[in-house]
């Protein structure tokens, strides 16, 4: 009981009814626990993939080249993205408060933006990290069993998928817990604007990761074809052609890390946009506890639905 009182005092606005707070906390903590279980599942699937045979020395050498190239590209991309994120973070901190018009975005929106950027980048990196290691193990498994190769490849995709949805759900529920249950005071007007920062952060990373990775992929593909096949007469995808490695690096950073960030942005955007629609559907005639219950129920509906989706997956 004492712990519950501390949690209520920490996360709930003073104007919110106790019953509404209990429901809000329960649904958020439940969704957070489900998201954590999804991340644990992704980590376990990754460990199962890493336990598979990685093939002979030549296979591992080629795979290592792709892994190092993908890691180097993401490191360079994220380094420049960090500058962009820092600039936008500062602008959100100092440039969006307007007390005269009842707008209080500032540091809360900036924190949500930073969390969205971090979650999106993490999901993309972890998915790419798994994919570059699963590819060689899928090839080795295909030497003995088609079903074994499918199992490794499918598990690799599962890691990316579960990481994306779980990271998105973790970020949103943490923000909801951090900012507390909405009530009828002025915070209710700006509440969803705070959380919009999370979607903005996810979209920012997705934009650069998807487009940047795609450009790199196409440049390596065209360059490898022109120089390798046309000029040197080396067959396509031959490991003797350095552009083949670059092409495979591009496939991973664009179609895995970039696509993962893109899917993360779409997933988070769908949840938050549904919550915004829910805010607009609250009947205007409701007051007091009835208004807060309707507000909280419609806000939490997309979050709980997403949590059910994680369980179903």
Q: Where are each of the predicted segments found?
A:
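Hydrophobic packing and interface segments
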Residues: 3-313
């Amino acid at each position: 009981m004492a712990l519950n009182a501390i949690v209520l005092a920490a996360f709930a606005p003073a104007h919110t009814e106790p019953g509404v707070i209990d429901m809000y906390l329960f649904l958020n903590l439940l969704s957070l626990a489900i998201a954590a279980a999804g991340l644990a599942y992704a980590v376990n699937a990754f460990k199962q993939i890493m336990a598979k045979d990685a093939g002979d020395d030549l296979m591992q050498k080629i795979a290592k080249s792709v892994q190092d190239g993908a890691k180097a590209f993401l490191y360079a991309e994220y380094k420049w993205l960090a500058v962009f994120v820092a600039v936008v973070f500062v602008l959100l901190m100092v440039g969006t408060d307007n007390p005269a018009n009842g707008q209080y975005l500032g540091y809360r929106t900036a924190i949500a933006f930073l969390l969205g950027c971090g979650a999106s980048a993490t999901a993309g990196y972890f998915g790419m990290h798994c994919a570059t290691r699963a590819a060689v193990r899928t090839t080795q498994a295909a030497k003995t069993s088609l079903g074994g190769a499918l199992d490794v490849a499918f598990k690799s995709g599962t890691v990316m998928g579960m990481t994306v949805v779980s990271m998105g759900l973790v970020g949103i529920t943490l923000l909801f817990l951090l900012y507390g249950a909405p009530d009828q005071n002025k915070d209710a007007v700006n509440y969803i604007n705070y959380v919009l920062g999370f979607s903005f952060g996810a979209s920012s990373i997705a934009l650069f990761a998807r487009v940047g990775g795609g450009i790199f992929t196409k440049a390596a593909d065209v360059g490898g074809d022109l120089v390798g096949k046309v000029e040197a007469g080396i067959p396509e995808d031959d490991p003797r052609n350095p552009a083949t490695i670059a092409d495979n690096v591009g496939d991973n950073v664009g179609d895995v890390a970039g696509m993962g960030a893109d899917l993360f942005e779409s997933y988070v955007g769908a949840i938050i946009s549904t919550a915004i629609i829910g805010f607009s559907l609250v009947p205007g005639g409701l007051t007091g506890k009835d208004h807060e219950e309707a507000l909280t129920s419609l806000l939490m509906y997309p979050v709980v639905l997403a949590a059910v989706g994680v369980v179903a997956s």
